[in-house]
């Protein structure tokens, strides 16, 4: 493709390479390093004048360092006269801080949106935003892609009894997500209502729906410490589910997450590769990965060629 340059930040180079391979491109030359005082240094190693630039950087790992690196890369390309800079952020950082849920709380997702715009981003491509209203925090175009088509494909190909499954949301907020998947599979859905006492602590869970003698598939956009989904798995099995799977777009898996998954009764915990999972998979055989590089690659190709991206909301590109 002419007039396109693809750069990778240091957060998820494996995903960036997969996207580049699918597009038939070489990743652009960029050197990122830290000065002795821990400031981030970025050197763009090739001309981007008049080019359509895409920078792939996920909000994972050392999140603050990676966000700063992305902002500097965007700005470096912008002031080097690139025609357009698109930030491809598979897992959007600070997405859970999207509203004032208590007094004096910051809306950090809005701050990140402002920072990206000020740095010089012209367009954002992301996946399964924790809250879809984050798109409205930007004054530039945002394409929020969905992992749902890839999730549906995985369910049909890997769960033999999928026609006898029930899609379960671990909280009321994910009801829209699970009803969409349940409708596409033509199966029923259930949800678990949880009463939280404080962050990362779940108090009481109430199951709404009948899971007896069915394969329960928990679906959520992200899992961090995995307390919620592991409690939910126990709840579903005690309510008569034959097997429990969990399918998540963003597998953050921090703190006690891996030991909780190992001790829980999941058949599999399936995540996409918006966040690197290689190290986690070494310590947990239940984790399986859906590759979404083809969705990102096709979104980049369509954006570059001025084509519609909405086809990707319901189809997995070949």
Curated annotation (Swiss-Prot):
Gene3D superfamilies: 3.40.50.2020. Residues 212-227 are annotated as: Binding of phosphoribosylpyrophosphate. It comes from the Eukaryota. One of its GO terms (molecular function) is ribose phosphate diphosphokinase activity. Its cofactor is Mg(2+). Its EC number is 2.7.6.1. It catalyses: D-ribose 5-phosphate + ATP = 5-phospho-alpha-D-ribose 1-diphosphate + AMP + H(+). PROSITE patterns: PRPP_SYNTHASE. ATP binds at residues 96-101, 130. Disulfide bonds: none annotated. Belongs to the ribose-phosphate pyrophosphokinase family. This is Ribose-phosphate pyrophosphokinase 2. The gene is PRPS2.
């Amino acid at each position: 493709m002419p007039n396109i340059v693809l750069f990778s930040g240091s957060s998820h180079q494996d995903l960036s390479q997969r996207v580049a391979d699918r597009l038939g491109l070489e990743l652009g030359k960029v050197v990122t390093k830290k000065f002795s005082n821990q400031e981030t240094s970025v050197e763009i190693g090739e001309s981007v004048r008049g080019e359509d630039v895409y920078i792939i950087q996920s909000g994972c790992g050392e999140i603050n360092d990676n966000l700063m690196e992305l902002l500097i890369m965007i700005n470096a390309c912008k002031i080097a006269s690139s025609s357009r800079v698109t930030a491809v952020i598979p897992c959007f950082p600070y997405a859970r801080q999207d509203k004032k849920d208590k007094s004096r709380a910051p809306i950090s997702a809005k701050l990140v949106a402002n920072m990206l715009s000020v740095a010089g981003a012209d367009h954002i491509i992301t996946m399964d935003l924790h809250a879809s209203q984050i798109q409205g925090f930007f004054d530039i175009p945002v394409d929020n892609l969905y992992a749902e088509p890839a999730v549906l494909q995985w369910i049909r190909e890997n769960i033999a009894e999928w026609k006898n499954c029930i899609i379960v949301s671990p909280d009321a907020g994910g009801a829209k997500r699970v009803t969409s998947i349940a409708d596409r599979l033509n199966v029923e859905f259930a949800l678990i209502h949880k009463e939280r006492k404080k962050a990362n602590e779940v108090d009481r869970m109430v199951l709404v729906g009948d899971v007896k003698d069915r394969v329960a598939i928990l679906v959520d956009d992200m899992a961090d410490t995995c307390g919620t989904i592991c409690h939910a798995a126990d709840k579903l099995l005690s309510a008569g589910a034959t097997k429990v799977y969990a399918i998540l777009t963003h597998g953050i898996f921090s703190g006690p997450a891996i030991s909780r998954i190992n001790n829980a009764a999941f058949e599999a915990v399936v995540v996409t590769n918006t966040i690197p999972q290689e190290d986690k998979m070494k310590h947990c055989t239940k984790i399986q990965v859906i590759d979404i590089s083809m969705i990102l690659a096709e979104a980049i190709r369509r954006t570059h060629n001025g084509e519609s991206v909405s086809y990707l909301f319901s189809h997995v590109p070949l």
